[in-house]
Amino acid sequence: MARAVGIDLGTTNSVVAVLEGGDPVVVANSEGSRTTPSVVAFARNGEVLVGQPAKNQAVTNVDRTIRSVKREIGTDWSVEIDGKNYTPQEISARVLMKLKRDAESYLGEDITDAVITVPAYFNDAQRQATKDAGQIAGLNVLRIVNEPTAAALAYGLDKGEKEQTILVFDLGGGTFDVSLLEIGEGVVEVRATSGDNHLGGDDWDDRIVEWLVDKFKGTSGIDLTKDKMAMQRLREAAEKAKIELSSSQSTSINLPYITVDADKNPLFLDEQLTRSEFQKITQDLLDRTRKPFQSVIKDAGISVGEIDHVVLVGGSTRMPAVSELVKEMTGGKEPNKGVNPDEVVAVGAALQAGVLKGEVKDVLLLDVTPLSLGIETKGGVMTKLIERNTTIPTKRSETFTTADDNQPSVQIQVFQGEREIASHNKLLGSFELTGIPPAPRGVPQIEVTFDIDANGIVHVTAKDKGTGKENTIKIQEGSGLSKEEIDRMIKDAEAHADEDRKRREEADVRNQAESLVYQTEKFVKEQREAEGGSKVPEDTLTKVDAAISDAKAALAGTDIAAIKSAMEKLGEESQALGQAIYEATQAEQAAGGAPGGESTGASNSGDDVVDAEVVEDDQERK
């Protein structure tokens, strides 16, 4: 049975994990790191870069590098590059494709099934869009799981059968969630969840950038916000400074040649940022985490003292001010230090994948819907059918009637949110039930059913009890992608994957050819410069020279078939040269007699050993 992976598709970084012998293992990417930057870049030569390579070139390719796209998923945002619009789903799919490739390389087998995590406070549109991204990447998304739930699963599965209350405080690169869960006897049940989908480490970075811009403007009079390349350098420096301030009391931010003045003289940015100043300029961001925390405690109906464990998730929780605030809000409870905040979500996703595949037994995951769901009724009121923090999957029905006499149809508008007025909530979608027989208002019986699956994705049905007519909508308005569009994007992604594969193959062929040319050229030169002259006739060397010239000419062009052909020809000629040298050496030894032959052979052998060692050492240094 093919294995399934667990993927934490993050705003800043993403992680993939898999079960090995029943235990979750975080898979290192092709660059050797356990986390992959969620960055996608479109190079000028048509190559699509993902992860660290994309992040590395961001300064010189600002307009064609996309980061933190998770903040836009489930919206109609898009970016135009080379005349083509890319949706958040397509950009996210690039990151997922890289994680998929890295997992396949690690396991040595194809991967098709995956569990992907999302912030607990993601609405239906964002969940559907994440699932679409997985589909575009060639993955069968077994389940969409809430990040705090996955973290609790990873943390609590080995904590015995005693029931425990766990608070998960998840502050990532772009989103914030806080969830309260009960864990015991293999059951992970979410009691309540809340959050903010636009609060994360990126916001802390932005505050440092703003601080640097103000400081630089104050000393030089130049506004760096008008310089895209300078702003990208500031963002990277801000992220680095934020990380350093997690372990140091102050950090130096030094950016030479950040811009030039009116006389084209280079200007430098050199500032010292202290942890206290950093905390001062970001205090309001920190305070925004208080309300969701209080909401979760209230919704779960418990006191802070009943929390057994506090688990911090997301790289942003490494900031001392964050862990101190959590400690304060939980009545002095020390957050658990036994989990890696960057990896625990992917580990939990891998465990859930194992549950769905039957590899992990006796585990039941009971998640909740983060926001209430309902329809708009007369007067623009939001009538809730499913309250927030209801365990999913779930199904609820309620009967409504018409507002006017002889009303032939009803418009069902589906909303998600907590406001009493429907228009103040998030409109997920709408559909119409037609063919209602003429009748006075209040007589027709329209049954509306909400069905939420285990992924948190909503299906709504409206049925006229009198006629049996019904209409159903699967909410995907927020994702904005039809099946045809998803299919097209899958084909595009596959085409790009083929292009990338072809480009890699071409690079490999070119590298092999260049290496063969260099080694053969060097060998021929050594033969001509050898004491006593070459051991082989000049016409043999001339043939090799010609093959080298042909290979160089092919390398100057773009025809890979020509390079392969020239490389094969050069390989044949260099083999013939090697054979000729071997035969000449044997003939010399036979003519020179045993003692002389042995002496010459020993000397050559010694030289060969020394050369080999030097080459190996040199390669290691590289």
Swiss-Prot record:
Q: What residue spans carry the region label Disordered?
A: 494-513, 587-622
Query: What keywords sit in the KW lines?
Result: ATP-binding, Chaperone, Nucleotide-binding, Phosphoprotein, Stress response
Q: Record's PROSITE patterns?
A: HSP70_1, HSP70_2, HSP70_3
Bias kind Basic and acidic residues: ranges: 494-511
The highest taxon in the source lineage is Bacteria
**Biased composition regions of type Acidic residues, renumbered to the chain:** 608-622
Induction pattern: By stress conditions e.g. heat shock.
Q: Pfam families per the record?
A: HSP70
Q: Does the keyword Iron apply?
A: no
Record GO terms (molecular function): ATP binding; ATP-dependent protein folding chaperone; unfolded protein binding
> Which Gene3D superfamilies does the entry mention?
1.20.1270.10, 3.30.420.40, Actin, Chain A, domain 4, Substrate Binding Domain Of DNAk, Chain A, domain 1
Q: Which residues carry this modification: Phosphothreonine?
A: T175
Q: Give all cystine bridges in this chain.
A: none
InterPro entries assigned? ATPase_NBD (IPR043129), Chaperone_DnaK (IPR012725), Heat_shock_70_CS (IPR018181), HSP70_C_sf (IPR029048), HSP70_peptide-bd_sf (IPR029047), Hsp_70_fam (IPR013126)
| Record PANTHER family | HEAT SHOCK PROTEIN 70KDA
Q: Which family does it belong to?
A: Belongs to the heat shock protein 70 family.
Q: What does this protein do?
A: Acts as a chaperone.
Q: What is this protein called?
A: Chaperone protein DnaK
Please give the organism. Mycolicibacterium gilvum (strain PYR-GCK) (Mycobacterium gilvum (strain PYR-GCK))
